[in-house]
Amino acid sequence: FQKYVEENLPHHRLRLVMLHPSDDRLNLQTIRDFFIQYPEVREGITFNSRAFRIAYYLDDLQRSPFRLLGYELLLPNVKALKEGKIRYLLSQRPELQGYRGMKALCEYKVFKKEVPRRNFMPIDILTAENIDYYTDFQLF
């Protein structure tokens, strides 16, 4: 991701914010300090499944409008998406990844077939407008 942004969006700067996995008060202060230093930032991405937590921190700090992109169709993420606190959710289809992984393992171990080194997987982009029509997932 960083390399892509550097090569294709050179006028954009990535800013890394490290958050604690379970300390909400510290995280809120960290984000508050970040926006004091970078008040112009209006969009962000998180590469873990807890996008909803960041969305609610931003809501507490009244950072609206803010375009947040998150990962994984966890129920709290979907709720935040529907509430407009997350703009986009990426679904990596973990059940399909698991199926293809087990299939490749079986083909390699049982049938002694060579398996491809790369296996490109679909990623679905979900919004508040299309989430209710998305049927290819299970909430975790």
Roles of regions detected by a PLM:
Residues 20-76:
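Hydrophobic alpha-helical
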Residues 9-11, 63, 83-84, 120:
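Short, well-ordered coil/turn elements that cap or connect secondary structure elements
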Residues 12-14, 66, 87:
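A structural micro-motif
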Residues 5-8, 93-140:
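Hinge/cleft segment of the Venus flytrap/periplasmic-binding protein
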Residues 2-25:
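Short beta-strand elements in bilobed, periplasmic/extracellular small-molecule ligand-binding domains
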Residues 74-82, 86:
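Flexible loop/hinge segments that line or gate small-molecule binding clefts
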Residues 83-95:
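Short beta-strand elements at the ligand-binding edges of bilobed clamshell
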Residues 3, 30-33, 53, 100, ...:
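Alpha-helical elements of Rossmann-like donor-binding domains used by nucleotide-donor carbohydrate transfer enzymes
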